[in-house]
From Swiss-Prot:
Native source organism of the sequence: Drosophila melanogaster
Protein name as it appears in the record: Torsin-like protein
Compartments it resides in: Endoplasmic reticulum lumen
Cleaved signal peptide residues: 1-24
Role this protein plays: May serve as a molecular chaperone assisting in the proper folding of secreted and/or membrane proteins.
Record annotation: effect of changing residue 163 to N: In strain: MEL11 and MEL13
Keywords of the record: ATP-binding, Chaperone, Endoplasmic reticulum, Glycoprotein, Nucleotide-binding, Signal
One annotated Gene Ontology cellular component of this protein: endoplasmic reticulum lumen
Pfam families per the UniProt record, alphabetical: Torsin
Classification via PANTHER family: LD13476P-RELATED (PTHR10760:SF2), TORSIN (PTHR10760)
């Protein structure tokens, strides 16, 4: 954090190196420079102490903490851990060299961790986490319920994104339940997330856009099941095994990404698969939920809770009989009910 004397010195040094005749740098100019420096200093040390500002203090981007948290808490998603953290680190480190926003599309069945990871990204990036004024979240049919209103939704998204980026270029936009949005809703957004995305003087290149969708969840499960039955370990699968499949499915299946110019223009940087949960992963989710209730999952009575939920509430896919259909999505309430 820059001290006021240092800030004032820096501003005055600019005057020194400017190719101006000495007599043209009058006391009023020097006074104006001092006032600017003083205003910036007091904004940083007074206003921004009590209100959220678009600065490093309020946007600490604690990606190392995110990495440790995902390693500790994210269950069954090795591909996500391998790619999300490096993608964020590279985008943030590129700073002024970045030529486009970071655009990521999460795909997978319900209960595989898409919202969980998006929430952790917001918490790591912003001091206020998902409550930050610089985090905007849209929710499927709740925000875009009518197919007939697509044209209006496009304008709504475009204007809202621009307004937010004017306030803070380092904003995060999360679009959840993309598969429940009408086709074409994102077409006007394409120009804002493309290369050299400066619109009306607004720098969009530092922003992050995350799209969450159940689209292709069944495709991921089918492909993973086939791969595993052919003798390959789940943990040996890579992003390249799924990314082409996700891009094709998102473009062709119903939802906000169907036939979208965002895919046609190749502005989505990463299509990330969230793999379906196996029984062992669901057990780990149940153990984590019990720990959240300050219960030891190894105790006999808590082991009984896990066993009862697994046997009575978990259904598996018909094709491979490997993957829990709802993943870990409904476990919170089931554990709470079992405890009380």
């Amino acid at each position: 954090m820059m001290s006021f004397p240092r800030m004032l010195s820096l501003c005055l040094s600019v005057l020194v190196i400017l190719p101006l005749p000495l007599q043209s740098v009058d006391p009023l100019t020097i006074g104006a420079v001092g006032a600017v420096a003083l205003g910036a200093y007091f904004k940083e040390h007074t206003y921004c102490r009590f209100a959220e500002c678009c600065d490093d203090r309020n946007i600490p981007a604690r990606i190392d903490e995110l990495e440790r948290s995902l390693e500790r808490t994210l269950i069954g998603q090795h591909i996500v851990r391998q790619h999300i953290v490096p993608a964020l680190k590279a985008h943030i480190a590129s700073g002024n060299k970045s030529r486009k926003p970071l655009v990521i599309s999460f795909h997978g069945q319900p209960g595989t961790g898409k919202n969980f990871v998006a929430e952790q990204i917001a918490d790591a990036m912003y001091l206020k986490g998902s409550r930050s004024n610089y985090v905007t979240k849209y929710l499927g049919q709740a925000d875009f319920p009518k197919e007939s209103e697509v044209s209006n939704y496009r304008v709504k998204i475009n204007n809202a994104v621009r307004d937010t980026l004017r306030s803070c270029p380092r904003s995060l936009f999360i679009f959840d339940e993309v598969d429940k949005m009408p086709s074409g809703v994102f077409d006007q957004l394409t120009s804002l997330v493309d290369y050299n995305a400066f619109v009306d003087g607004t720098d969009n290149t530092k922003a992050i856009f995350i799209f969450l969708s159940n689209t292709a969840g069944s495709h991921i499960a089918s492909h993973l099941g086939s791969v595993m039955k052919n003798g390959r370990l789940r943990e040996d699968t890579r992003l390249s095994d799924f990314e082409p499949l996700l891009r094709k499915a998102a473009y062709n299946m119903d939802g906000g990404m169907k036939k979208t110019t965002m895919i046609e223009s190749h502005v989505i940087d990463h299509f990330i698969p969230f793999l379906p949960m196996e029984k062992a992963h669901v057990i780990k989710c149940l153990e984590a939920e019990l720990l959240r209730w300050r219960r030891d999952p190894k105790q006999a009575n808590n082991q009984k809770i896990i066993e009862d939920i697994i046997n009575s509430s978990i259904s598996y896919d018909r094709t491979h009989s490997l993957f829990a259909i709802s993943g870990c999505k409904t476990l919170e309430k089931k554990v709470a009910m079992a405890i009380y």
